[in-house]
Structure formats: C-alpha cells, structure tokens
Amino acid sequence: MTSKAIYPGTFDPMTNGHLDLVTRASLMFDHVILAIAASPSKKPLFSLDERVALATQVTSHLDNVEVLGFSELMAHFAAHQNANILVRGLRAVSDFEYELQLANMNRHLMPTLESVFLMPSEEWSFISSSLVKEVARHGGDIAPFLPDVVTQALMAKLAAA
C-alpha cells in the first residue's frame, strides 16, 4: 500500500519553512501533494496560478511531490485525490488550538483522514508568509527566508504595486 499525503496551505508566498516541511514529508510518504488553496478571503498577493507556478519551481527537485491548486473543502479535495493523510506544520503552541479544530472538522467530514503534525526546523520556526511580506514592504532583507525564485517574484510584485 502506498501512502499519499497532502500538505495544504495558501503559500502566499512559499517560504523556506514550507520547503522544509514538504521536503521532510516527501521522505515520510510515497507521494505528497502540495495543495495550494485559492483562499480568496485571505486576499492573497499572488494569484493561485502564480503560487502554483512558484511552488512547482521550488519543489522540482522532489520527485514524489506534486503541486495542485484547489478551492474546495480540504476533506473533499483529499477524497478526490485518494489521500488519507494531511501534513500540517506547528510553529508554536498558539498554532495548536486552531490546528486541532481543523483536524477534528476534517475527521468529521472524512473519518479516514488523519492529520500529521510536523514542527519546523528551528531556523524556520518564526517564519510566516505574512511576516515575510511585511518585512519586504518595509525594505527588510527577506532573502534568508525564501527560495531565490520566490524572493525575486515577491520583490517584483511589491515594486509593481
């Protein structure tokens, strides 16, 4: 039996913390879907197509990782992909309560869907996409926190705004 996991998120933009988690998930599971949520309510800076393209570039060295966009409920997406594992990152205790609620709701909607929580490597434990965007907007150096192609795309996007 092969294992298929989904690592969902908005990834606006994808950070080195995200890359750390998807890389580690790719070592744990036979197939990993990096599922990029449309998330229009979050008003993403990058379009869904842009986020999918960037994530595809960033993960191209991971042979068992597939990048897909989605706009449906996660449990429905997981069922359509024949996946029964969700990979989620926990940066801090403050993430746990929200993630617990999500895991319980997903299990209610799809009883065979299990959530697996990974802690980021220490060097990425304080990074979030929103924090990186805020630092970039104020002229801070974001290069250490993002893959190079994402840094270039973010700087170009902010310059065009």
From Swiss-Prot:
The record marks 18 as: Transition state stabilizer. It catalyses: (R)-4'-phosphopantetheine + ATP + H(+) = 3'-dephospho-CoA + diphosphate. Homohexamer. It comes from Serratia marcescens. Its EC number is 2.7.7.3. GO terms for biological process: coenzyme A biosynthetic process. Substrate binds at residues 10, 42, 74, 88. Its main location: cytoplasm. Pathway: Cofactor biosynthesis; coenzyme A biosynthesis; CoA from (R)-pantothenate: step 4/5. It is an enzyme of class 2 (transferase). Keywords: ATP-binding, Coenzyme A biosynthesis, Cytoplasm, Magnesium, Nucleotide-binding, Nucleotidyltransferase, Transferase. This is Phosphopantetheine adenylyltransferase. HAMAP family: PPAT_bact. GO terms for molecular function: ATP binding; pantetheine-phosphate adenylyltransferase activity. GO terms for cellular component: cytoplasm. It comes from the Bacteria. Its cofactor is Mg(2+). ATP binds at residues 10-11, 18, 89-91, 99, 124-130. SUPFAM superfamilies: Nucleotidylyl transferase. It is found in: Cytoplasm. Pfam families: CTP_transf_like.
